Amino acid sequence: MGGGRRDARTTGKKGQPWYIEIPLLVVIALVLVFVFQTFVGRVYQIPSESMEPTLHGCAGCTGDRIFVDKISYRFGDPQPGDVVVFEGPDSWNQGYQSIRSDNPVIRTLQDIGGVIGIVPPDQNDMVKRVVAVGGQTVGGCSPDGGLLVDGEPLDEPYLNAEPALERNPLNCAFGPVTVPEGNYWVMGDNRGNSADSRFHMGDEFQGTVPEENIIGKVRAIILPFSRIGTVPSPDINAG
């Protein structure tokens, strides 16, 4: 009897060998990363100056890394003032160059990395601020040079204080454009140095971005440490 009890205590299933367990854990981790990046959120790096001073980026420097929430817009629509990441419509992609290697082996590895979220996707993703939504009319200048939406000036405290006006004279003197339902008019905070909706008014969407192209809402800057913080979505129609 006593020997039987000892056998019951000492008998059990052995764990998997390390050479099976470790690859299995890696696969599980990659699946979890894929699920998170696909349905919950993703980290992006800012490549240009178009969203200064809200988001820092420039050619040849290390731009802000931002966390993009993919859940919020499953339960609601983007609102004026939101900073969003979106996939560029066709007219926005002219001149876009693939970020994948010409080497087929490396390219395949990059594609796999893109699927699981450890390598940027090979698509022209952009970050801008929603200025007007479906049914609103955007364009024209107020007496003090502010942008008009539905004839009223926006309250835009986030704008770059010293925009390079000589590089982009269309800060508010365009349109007016009535945004199609389900689409969004987007612009950079660095209004004088941003190739945004204003530059695509001749396309099929009149420069707007379709809802299905919206990837998510920018919630926070996570790197560098000196710039960690949330990215606000002010009520820009309050003016």
Predicted regions and their residues:
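Soluble "head" domains of membrane/secretory-pathway proteins
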Residues: 2-23, 35, 39-45, 53-239
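Hydrophobic alpha-helical transmembrane segments of multi-pass integral membrane proteins
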Residues: 27-35
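A short acidic/basic microdomain associated with nuclease active sites
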Residues: 48
